[in-house]
A protein has these predicted regions:
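Histidine/acidic-residue-rich, glycine-tolerant segments that coordinate divalent metal ions
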Residues: 2, 8-134, 139-143, 228
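Metal-dependent amide/peptide-bond hydrolase catalytic core
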Residues: 108-236
């Protein structure tokens, strides 16, 4: 981007309007409880004076050769949401599990049951990822754990699927925990939105990219389930 800025600064007579370059940290969002990334830059006026009529984002990628560029119209990068589930059971001695409610067993079944949301509860043609990345529970090898915490991420490329997932998760957790006599707390946080590339802008820039790079070096991309808070700029 710096190279492009340098070239454009030398050809100012060809520019009819204003071009603004944004160099943003924390493109996958700031740490929990902090401000940062695209939302903070917007809040601090990065898109004001002048206000852009269109915005384009660039990412480097090891999957493309030098001199190539990848592009995709429509839904391109997934929305990213996060969740924390706390399973609550009842402690007992490991030799007498029938006297307790094993939060580890309940949590393990919840992890597996949540995967059926993708395979059995949502349209199989709509991409969805439910990943549990952290499991913490128990404090002694011979004691039935009374609490297990699960944390994970949800990725979606369709806003309706995204809207439905929290309720489907609650239904799943209700069913599993009730079978074992356990309970749970569920915290769901919506984070970055879907990156949706305007098809008209993509078509307009494709012609230029092919002129400069050649048809063979403009690569159509599949959708990605990774996320990028560039989507905040698109909502302004």
């Amino acid at each position: 981007a710096l190279g492009v800025a340098q070239i454009l600064s030398q050809r100012g007579e060809l520019i009819h309007g204003s071009i603004k370059f944004i160099f943003q940290p924390a493109e996958e969002g700031p740490p929990e409880g902090e401000e940062g990334g695209a939302s903070l830059m917007i809040k601090e006026g990065a898109l004001e004076n002048p206000r852009p009529q269109a915005i384009f984002g660039l990412h480097t990628s090891p999957s493309l050769e030098a001199g190539q560029i990848g592009v995709r119209p429509g839904a391109t990068m997934a929305a990213s949401d996060g969740f924390t589930i706390t399973i609550r059971g009842k402690k007992a001695h490991g030799a007498q599990p029938h006297l307790g409610v094993d939060a580890v067993v309940v949590a393990a079944e919840c992890v597996m049951a949540l995967q059926t949301i993708r395979s059995r509860r949502t349209d199989s043609t709509q991409p969805l990822v439910i990943s549990v990345g952290m499991i913490h529970g128990g404090n002694r090898f011979n004691i039935i754990a009374d609490e297990v915490k699960l944390e994970g991420t949800i990725r979606t490329l369709d806003e309706e699927v995204r809207r439905r997932v929290p309720e489907l998760m609650r239904q799943t957790l209700d069913g599993v925990t009730s079978v074992y006599g356990a309970s749970y707390d569920f915290d769901y946080k919506r984070r970055t939105a879907i990156v949706f590339n305007d098809p008209a802008l993509v078509d307009e820039t494709l012609r230029v990219m092919k002129q400069v790079l050649g048809n063979d070096n403009v690569i159509p991309l599949p959708p990605f389930m990774v996320s990028e808070d560039y989507s905040y700029y698109q909502q302004v």
